[in-house]
Amino acid sequence: MLNDFTGADKVYIACGYTDLRKGIDGLARMVQKQFELDPFTNTLFLFCGRRRDRIKDLYWEKDGYILLYKRLEQGAYQWPRSESEARSLTPQQYRWLMEGLKIEQPKAHRPVTELAVL
C-alpha cells in the first residue's frame, strides 16, 4: 500500500529520529508545532524510529486521520538523520525511499533546467 501511495498532494519526511510510541495526536502536534505545517491538508507525513526498520505515516482523509505503521522484515530505510526538520519529497524520491534507496541518488539523471536548441 505505501510503496505506491498516490492519494496525497505532497509528501514530507521528518528527518532524524522520531519516537514511534507517539500516536495520531502526538504526531499531528509535531507536524503543527515543530515543523509549522498543517496536518489537515492532503499531505502524507512520514516518521522513522531509531532502528530504521519501522515507519509511521500520518494522513488526513477529510473526516479523520489514517495512521499507518510498517515494519520491514529485512533491511532498513535509508532515512536522513542529519536534521530535525520536515523535508518535502518528490514522487521519485518517495519511491526511492520505499524501495530502500537514499532519497538523494548521485547517479540518477537530473532534470534539465535550462533548455536551448543547438
Go through each PLM region and give its residues:
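Polybasic/polar functional segments that serve as interface/processing modules
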Residues: M1-L118
